[in-house]
Amino acid sequence: MTREILETMRNTSFDIPYVYYMDHTDGMIVPCSIRVTDKTLIIGKGLMKWQDKLYIMTQPVTIGYYPTEEWRVLKIRFLPQTESKDFTLFDTDIFLDEDIQIKDDEMEIGRFKLKAGSRLRQNYVDFHDLNTEFDTLNVILTPFAGIGSPTISPQITRHFAREAYPHTIGMPFDNGFICTCMNSERPVSRELITCYVKARLALKKNYFTGDELYAHLSHILADIKKGIAVDGYNRRSRDRKIFVE
């Protein structure tokens, strides 16, 4: 093959994912894998979008960590582009930061508080464990690329769906949302989650932050486990009634 053909194939192969995600907002597309050792975090491959560009993490990055019992945020910083004769380089820097604010050129991967003598973990027992304060990697505020606006981690919606599903007999409104969460390969859109939360809890607000969405889903999950449907009736109590003529 000629050099021109090879360059065309190379450029086209990278254009395919860009076209696929061109209508998405900034945010994670494929979250970086994170392997935890006693003293280091090993950040693996991932794909994200920022300012209309796709960034692919191809090489692992090792970052040291230690207990502080204060929030530490694992961030990606998008560096200014650099020019050379043959190409333009868009590079990133991954680091731990004690500043919990996310600057305009940064994106959050996750955050944690670590106690002395403890080890950071990312295997969640249940939905509520996603928000455990200490010794647990928290991804509730990690933005995921979506249509119209960034959305929340699919770990949140999948944990919600798995726990809620066994309790939703006779709750078709909840079943529809839960099946979407369980079957979707991509993160669930923020618009759908917001519409579900607003209808389920009779809320008027049109926008919720990531931690607000998590809190509302937690409230809904508690109601579902009690048998309380969207119309306010307790399905369990109603099903147990015996009518005698």
Segments predicted by a language model, with ranges:
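N-terminal "first-domain core" detector
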Residues: 1-48, 54
